[in-house]
From Swiss-Prot:
Species: Thermococcus kodakarensis (strain ATCC BAA-918 / JCM 12380 / KOD1)
The protein, known as: Uracil phosphoribosyltransferase
Any GO MF annotation of the entry: GTP binding
Pathway as given in its UniProt record: Pyrimidine metabolism; UMP biosynthesis via salvage pathway; UMP from uracil: step 1/1
Enzyme Commission designation: 2.4.2.9
Amino acid sequence: MKRDERWEGVYSFEDSPFIMEILTELRDESTGPIAFRKGLVKLGRYMAYEITKTMATEKVPIRTPLEETEGIIVKDRRNVVIITVLRAAIPLMEGLIKVFEHARVGIVSASRGKAPKFEIEMKYVKVPRIKAEDTVIIADPMIATGSTLIKVLDEVKKYGNAKRYVVVGVLAAPEGITRIKEAHPDVEMFVAAIDRELNDHGYILPGLGDAGDRAFGEPIRFEDGAPGGI
């Protein structure tokens, strides 16, 4: 894990060969939905392990079968709220919760409109009460323009003031990171890799395509109303 010097509190895992191997499989257009979902779960899990290194720890007395000694617990691991941005973040959240098994979970449905406005529509928000000792982790695989996460952070912060706000993603574009840090300077960001740029349609380059579609299949879009005149 390394800090990106362009921003405060932004970290990538481009120095981790294992995480880069998982990311390579996710980028490959020949990777099918099953392997893609499994890759997102693995990334969530291993990135969660790394995030625990930034959390407060506490020494505790314990007794082994042979003698008394001292152990360590990751104290902050017990005060985590994971916010899942539907639908692409579901496998990523599954990996995170394997490490943060005490976490309370919130669900947000937010979708980004088409270029050039990229307007964000939020249709569903279920967030638990946030406490002062909490670390709030927002899982969203693709951090492109940053518009979705800015809107989600605006909403989540209404539910209480947390100790930390952390974004976990697979890929991020520099444009999106800059916008998020300008809107929410207190937010830390952990991503597998920071890619080159966005294209005119708001997709990350070189990227990996639409994470939701690749994980769950491309949805049917009825441009002229519901099927069969329903």
